Amino acid sequence: MKPASRVMPMLSAADMGRALAFYEGVLGGEKIYQFPPEGDPVFLTLRFGTTELGIGLLSGQTLHGRPQRPASGHRIELCINVDDVDACVVALRGIGAPVALEPVDQPWGERAAYVEDPDGNLVMLVAPAG
């Protein structure tokens, strides 16, 4: 068996417009795929450098037949490297993103903050400290 050739995290979004404002508008993801190709997307892929993120619209139906959301807590968090954690938190707060952890220098040499995306997924923002 050959090793996997690619791993792409996928998130569910209740409002694709709000998800795009967060991931494309503020964090700078580049839309590289949309389905359907015209009109309002139900799925899209964004590229961040060499990494890709899939976002699917919550529809109530899944291919696997399981709920799209956990009963409580969270099952995934994203870690996104940015140039300026503080400026990014200000911009995301400006579009209504809740801040779970204000920017703070970490002992391992990074400045980090946590915000929630429009669907409550935790997003860790990191940059080199100092």
Predicted regions and their residues:
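Conserved active-site tyrosine of GNAT-family acetyltransferases
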Residues: 19-24, 92, 120
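Charged catalytic carboxylate motif
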Residues: 18, 84
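Short acidic-aromatic low-complexity motifs
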Residues: 13-17
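Vicinal oxygen chelate
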Residues: 1-10, 30-81, 87-116, 126-130
